[in-house]
From Swiss-Prot:
Name of the featured protein: Pyridoxine 5'-phosphate synthase
Site (Transition state stabilizer): 151
Annotated EC: 2.6.99.2
Species classification: Bacteria, Bacillati, Cyanobacteriota, Cyanophyceae, Synechococcales
Main subcellular location: cytoplasm
Record's function text: Catalyzes the complicated ring closure reaction between the two acyclic compounds 1-deoxy-D-xylulose-5-phosphate (DXP) and 3-amino-2-oxopropyl phosphate (1-amino-acetone-3-phosphate or AAP) to form pyridoxine 5'-phosphate (PNP) and inorganic phosphate.
UniProt-listed CDD domains: PNPsynthase
Reactions it catalyzes: 3-amino-2-oxopropyl phosphate + 1-deoxy-D-xylulose 5-phosphate = pyridoxine 5'-phosphate + phosphate + 2 H2O + H(+)
UniProt-annotated catalytic positions: 43, 70, 190
Top EC category: transferase
Amino acid sequence: MATLGVNIDHIANVRQARRTVEPDPVQFAFLAELGGADSITVHLREDRRHIQDRDIFLLKETIKTKLNLEMAATEEMLKISKKLLPDFVTLVPEKREEVTTEGGLNVKNNQRYLKDYVTSLKSSNIEVSAFIDPLSEQINSSAEIGFDFIELHTGKYSELKGQERYVELQKIIESTHYAFDLGLVVNAGHGLNYQNAEKIASINNINELNIGHSIVARALAVGLERAVSEMKALISTN
């Protein structure tokens, strides 16, 4: 049964729209946990467009579940993460002009740099994941480098319809099994919602789904605790 990681970046987006102190993502992380979240995910971007440094350090001190820090593989973020000591770090690609993360990390083309980076994080007892597209070459490189986890990018699956979505789903299923056989723990996320998450959650060997936007959108109508609870029930029926 897949567990649920709740991304609270969009709470911070609302706060930063007015450069004020509310809503506080730290407070909403507590509500997400009450709703059944198994972990809390935040992306500390280089431009600090939503989550801020104070958020991640307060979250580390206050949440009862696990903290997953998404970040680019930069020297600044390495220093911050080694000071914070989150439960997990997920390395993601990052472009300043993007609205949200647009694709997976190219582990294959950056193996030498990423191997040293991952080794440094693991020396601080931080488990490390790579956010990658469901491609065998990226999975192979992730295993070779020493990542503990991968997070399969489900954005394309979420955008497609009909037969094209089915084909992409098969790629994710095959990638999950392939990565699991290589000893990687497999998470998945990006674009998942109340209509499409169940099929991903039902894949054997999927460990956790990371979901943010759709839960926060649903929370506007029913509150965050209930929105998380509904998603948790949805992905736990398999």
